[in-house]
Amino acid sequence: MEKQESDYNMIDWWKKVAFRNYANFSGRARRAEYWYFVLGNFILIIPFYVLAIVGVSNENIGLSLLGNIVYLVIALGFFIPGLAVAVRRLHDINKSGWYYFIVLIPLIGAIVLLVWFFTDGDRFTNNYGADPKNLNEVEFDFERPEITSL
């Protein structure tokens, strides 16, 4: 039996993005899904980054090279799921994934993107799908006045 998202811990969220939704650019991602993936990558990459820095400071080229190679492999491996979850996070606030390119505007773009990533998503269905926090949402069809479950 698969866990409900309400029971997920950091590792469950990270695995959801890294493996089950590796290149899924459609739909919506909750803040928890995005930020736990970012935190998981940070925890995974930091030891190798430190290894590279220690290697340089001790003039140990082999150690530095090893740290840099592993760091690069991990960073490249998680580039696509990182981009995909960022696009889905933007979808959660009803913005197109193309808004991710705002990060190319020095300083201001990164700040705006960071604010958007911290913003709570739309509470109901938007242009990109149902609210990932409330999958039991009920939608009202004004043309046929009856309540239908999604």
PLM ranges: what are they?
Residues A32-R89, I93-F118:
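Hydrophobic alpha-helical transmembrane segments in multi-pass membrane proteins
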Residues M1-G40, G82-W98, W116-L150:
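Membrane-interface extramembranous regions at the lipid-water interface
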